[in-house]
Swiss-Prot record:
Organism, as annotated: Mannheimia succiniciproducens (strain KCTC 0769BP / MBEL55E)
Protein name: Small ribosomal subunit protein uS13
Function: Located at the top of the head of the 30S subunit, it contacts several helices of the 16S rRNA. In the 70S ribosome it contacts the 23S rRNA (bridge B1a) and protein L5 of the 50S subunit (bridge B1b), connecting the 2 subunits; these bridges are implicated in subunit movement. Contacts the tRNAs in the A and P-sites.
A GO CC term assigned to this protein in UniProt: cytosol
Family: Belongs to the universal ribosomal protein uS13 family.
Pfam families (alphabetical): Ribosomal_S13
Gene name of the encoded protein: rpsM
Annotated segments matching region Disordered: 94-118
Record-level GO BP terms: translation
Subunit details: Part of the 30S ribosomal subunit. Forms a loose heterodimer with protein S19. Forms two bridges to the 50S subunit in the 70S ribosome.
Keyword Ribosomal protein: yes
KW Endoplasmic reticulum (keyword) present: no
UniProt xrefs under InterPro entries: Rbsml_uS13_C, Ribosomal_uS13, Ribosomal_uS13-like_H2TH, Ribosomal_uS13_bac-type, Ribosomal_uS13_CS
Amino acid sequence: MARIAGINIPDHKHTVIALTAIYGIGKTRSQAICAAAGIAENVKISELSEEQIDKLRDEVGKFTVEGDLRREVTLNIKRLLDLGCYRGLRHRRGLPVRGQRTKTNARTRKGPRKPIKK
């Protein structure tokens, strides 16, 4: 297994799909990384040489991924909470942040229904 950005990349998958195992890299960014490194998208990770894997590591290193990205997202949410703005209050209350309706739906964000005790 190749290790890129501290993550074990699955050997049996194609390069584009395997790179999406890294937090912060989706399919589009993965395709861009493969193109920049000069690696075909349909080649499996196990078929790559060490030089090609090093090229992939260099290209992935240009982006904010994994722990740094998680930390950045957490700090952004914490900043909103500290500001006390509307979005911060929605985060604090565990409600949808981006204007979705909450009279019905929003169950994922609000959690399971709490029965009214009589």
